[in-house]
C-alpha cells in the first residue's frame, strides 16, 4: 500500500496488514534503513506545471572508445527526468520533459554539446499510464522487514491477541 499511497498513516497500514501500529512503524523504518523504501515523492502533472512535451532521447557517443561518463556529463540538465543504460544500438535512453518543441530542440543541442553524442528522439503523443507502483503484498513486505531484525510484535498485546 505504501508504494501506491505514500501518505497512508501507520494506523491505516497496521489495520490493513493486521499488525500493531508500533510493529508497522518499526518495520517501515527498517525498510527505509535497508534501502527497500528509497523515498517518498509528490507526483506533479507535467502539463499543469508547464512541461507538456515528453520525449525519449536515445544517445550514442561519437567515439565508442571514449570513457562512459555520459550520465555525469548530462546530470546538470534538469529537463532530463531519467537516464537509463540500455542494450542495443544506443548506450542510453533519456526521458525528458520540456515546455515546447523549441525547448526540445535547444535541449537536444545541449545534450549533443555536453556529451559528444548523436541523438534519436521519439516524442510522446499520449501517456495512458506511468509511475505504476509494483503490486506488493503489504504483509509480506512488512514480514520481510521483521525477518531482518527483532520486532516489537513479540511484546505487543494487540498482536498477541491476534495469534
Predicted regions and their residues:
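A compositional/biophysical signature of low hydrophobicity enriched in polar/charged and small residues
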Residues: 1-163
Amino acid at each position: 500500500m505504501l508504494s501506491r499511497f505514500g501518505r497512508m498513516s501507520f494506523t491505516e497500514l497496521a489495520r490493513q496488514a493486521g499488525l500493531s501500529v508500533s510493529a508497522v512503524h518499526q518495520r517501515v523504518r527498517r525498510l527505509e534503513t535497508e534501502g527497500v523504501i528509497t523515498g517518498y515523492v509528490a507526483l506533479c502533472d507535467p502539463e499543469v506545471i508547464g512541461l507538456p512535451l515528453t520525449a525519449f532521447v536515445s544517445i550514442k557517443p561519437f567515439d565508442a572508445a571514449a570513457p562512459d561518463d555520459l550520465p555525469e556529463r548530462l546530470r546538470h540538465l534538469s529537463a532530463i527526468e531519467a537516464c537509463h543504460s540500455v542494450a542495443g544500438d544506443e548506450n542510453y535512453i533519456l526521458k525528458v520533459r520540456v515546455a515546447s518543441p523549441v525547448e526540445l530542440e535547444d535541449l537536444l543541442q545541449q545534450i549533443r554539446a555536453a556529451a559528444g553524442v548523436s541523438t534519436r528522439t521519439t516524442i510522446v503523443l499520449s501517456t495512458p499510464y506511468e509511475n505504476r507502483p509494483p503490486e506488493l503484498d503489504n504483509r509480506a513486505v512488512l514480514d520481510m522487514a521483521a525477518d531482518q531484525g527483532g520486532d516489537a510484535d513479540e511484546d505487543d498485546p494487540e498482536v498477541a491477541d491476534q495469534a
